């Protein structure tokens, strides 16, 4: 920069990314006494319902973003397509079955990350167990903070999330590491108010609500996410034992 100097291109490059929001639904049948219950009792029921919705929504987002599956069926979703880590991230470290050198595997995965900071890691419970079993040359645990099933928020200063969704609905996924702060984004496009349905068979269970003295509570939301920088991540998969 110089006084009266000519302005030049700053080097930033912008490319549009299209993120298509996906509608997700959560519902539960409850007794039709919900309609006539006191305000206090209805609030208690709705609190429990909302807690369930929040947990299912978080789990569903993980499964869709990690593996590109329909959380309800476990099958690949054509709507999600390649907008998931398993399809978008090409940097892969295959660990031998048994995950004997889990620490070395993570070091190899981090070495593959290109163009981004390593800001976090998501690991499956079995990978956490493998890390807990790592020892130093003198036999002491390499990660004593993982003893007895403990799942700390950080390991070696790196934020870590131990989550079953890393391996659920996937044959070999065990860990994801990379720039979760800058390379992946998600959010709500729209949240639809809670609906209380008193008639019909809204969950296609074959059981009429009136016939079973029930009402159906339904909550829906539109979620969107994107793996903005696939090169800023690496995946760890576990080799499959032949004949197992």
Regions found by a protein language model. Give the residues of each.
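Assembly/oligomerization interface modules of large self-assembling protein complexes
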Residues: 1-27, 51, 232
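Conserved aromatic-histidine-acidic binding/catalytic patches
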Residues: 16, 41-45, 205
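Residues immediately flanking
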Residues: 30-32, 125, 219
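Alpha-helical scaffold segments that mediate packing/assembly in large oligomeric complexes
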Residues: 25, 29-112, 235-236, 240-244
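Extended oligomerization regions of viral-like shell subunits
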Residues: 86-87, 91-208, 213-215
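Protruding loop/beta-arch "assembly-hinge" segments enriched in small, turn-prone residues
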Residues: 205-244
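Short loop/turn segments at secondary-structure transitions that flank enzyme active sites
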Residues: 25, 34, 59, 127-129, ...
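Short conserved micro-motifs at the rims of enzyme active sites and ligand-binding pockets
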Residues: 1, 40, 132-136, 170-174, ...
